Design a protein with these regions (language model features):
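Hydrophobic, Leu/Ile/Phe/Ala-enriched alpha-helical segments that form helix-helix packing faces
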Residues: 1, 58, 62, 82-86
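Eukaryotic partner-binding/assembly regions in large regulatory complexes
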Residues: 1-22, 82
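Accessory beta->alpha helical hairpin/"wing" motif in late/C-terminal subdomains of nucleic-acid enzymes
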Residues: 3-9, 79, 87-99
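Short, solvent-exposed interaction modules
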Residues: 23-30, 56-62
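Positively charged, polyanion-binding regions of nucleic-acid-associated proteins
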Residues: 27-48
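A structural feature that tracks compact, well-ordered secondary-structure segments
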Residues: 38-43, 84-92
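Short acidic, hydrophobic short linear motifs in intrinsically disordered regions
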Residues: 45-69
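Short amphipathic alpha-helical interaction segments
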Residues: 68-87
């Protein structure tokens, strides 16, 4: 059992109510989660990063308004994704701050 691996499953033809992340309310949040996972894939397990590095990565890889950080809604969606990632043990906070 490797705790650093994530299992991806095939999406069924008909989505069921139990599928998905209940804390997410938009497709953009799933896109941010995928971007976060892609960003982390290129880093060592204990390597630290700052939020601006992640947002620069997302901006470079996601076109359009979804990566416009001047929009409050985009910042809130990213924070929701980061909170989920912390709850799941995907990332940790080392700066003493909270999301």
């Amino acid at each position: 059992d490797n705790s650093l691996l994530i299992k991806m499953e095939k999406i069924p033809v008909i989505p069921e109510s139990f599928m998905g992340i209940m804390k997410f309310s938009s497709k953009e949040e799933y896109a941010y989660l995928c971007m976060l996972l892609m960003y982390l894939e290129d880093r060592d397990a204990q390597e630290q990063f700052i939020l601006s590095q992640l947002t620069e990565y997302i901006t470079a890889n996601l076109p359009g308004d979804i990566s416009d950080w001047t929009l409050y809604t985009n910042r809130r969606k990213l924070i929701r994704v980061l909170r989920f990632a912390v709850e799941q043990g995907i990332v940790g906070i080392t700066d003493g701050g909270t999301l």
